[in-house]
């Protein structure tokens, strides 16, 4: 396994489709493994492309201004619980509501359990339980709706490896919650911990940009080189090629860049603004 730390080289690899991601175990029958095998993050080629298109279609239905307003409202209501609890719960709950989950306020706890397992896929009974609950909530929230399914017919690869009892969109909706928990919650908490957060003259956008550049919530990702070498890409390493500040790689780069960057920033900005206004 090779560590890649220089940001220019990390960006080059992220932008090169010849570098694949490690794929999930599509043969496993564990619920968390089946979920992992049904998302875009751990798929390559045409399967990844189909799932990515569907993720983008789901996100296109979420108005970022409405999302920010909901995040601000939930933050105000949860303010007595403290900033850490707000950061852990609000991003997942407001996104779950917009994505049509049944009982969105109950989603943060199982999402946290599944997110702990998500990057590695190591066997986890709590993750299996959480995956079962979340997939059921994703389905239940849509069983009486006319959901738009453009690009997700049975032959597009969206549901490959998931199982016949899991519709094509449920795993992708859960994927968005899991990745929001890991990235957006961490972004909020880190921004609020910055000393500059206590200075009302410093815009929230500057706080978020600082965290994303210098201390991204998700600091590593993995790729498989064309020669089979396993690579660990560090998103927070040095950037000797940049004449000014280091480039920001928190949302990735290239064809697998985070599809929900605007949504994450809308939620984080609203939450941090509300907490700082206290």
Give short role names for the model-derived ranges.
Residues 1-278:
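Cytochrome P450
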């Amino acid at each position: 396994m090779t560590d890649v730390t220089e940001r220019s080289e990390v960006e080059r690899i992220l932008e090169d489709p010849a570098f694949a991601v490690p794929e999930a175990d599509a043969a496993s029958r564990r619920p968390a493994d089946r979920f992992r095998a049904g998302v875009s993050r751990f798929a390559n080629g045409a399967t990844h492309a189909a799932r990515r298109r569907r993720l983008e279609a789901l996100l296109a239905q979420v108005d970022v201004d409405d999302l920010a307003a909901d995040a601000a409202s939930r933050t105000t209501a949860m303010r007595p619980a403290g900033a850490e609890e707000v950061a852990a719960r609000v991003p997942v709950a407001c996104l779950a509501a917009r994505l049509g989950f049944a009982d969105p306020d109950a989603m943060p706890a199982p999402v946290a359990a599944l997110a702990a397992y998500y990057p590695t896929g190591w066997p986890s009974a709590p993750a299996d339980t959480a995956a079962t609950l979340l997939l059921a909530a994703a389905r239940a929230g849509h069983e009486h709706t006319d959901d738009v399914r453009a690009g997700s017919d049975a032959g597009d690869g969206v549901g490959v490896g998931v199982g016949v009892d899991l519709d094509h969109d449920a795993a992708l909706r859960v994927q968005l919650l899991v990745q929001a928990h890991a990235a957006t919650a961490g972004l909020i908490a880190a921004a609020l911990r910055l000393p500059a957060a206590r200075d009302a003259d410093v815009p929230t956008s500057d706080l978020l940009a600082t965290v994303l550049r210098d201390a991204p919530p998700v600091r590593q990702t993995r790729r498989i080189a064309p020669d089979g070498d396993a690579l660990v890409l560090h998103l927070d390493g040095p950037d000797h090629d940049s004449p000014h500040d280091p480039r920001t790689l928190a949302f990735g780069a290239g064809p697998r860049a985070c599809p929900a960057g605007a949504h994450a920033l809308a939620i984080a900005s609203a939450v941090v603004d509300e907490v700082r206004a206290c």
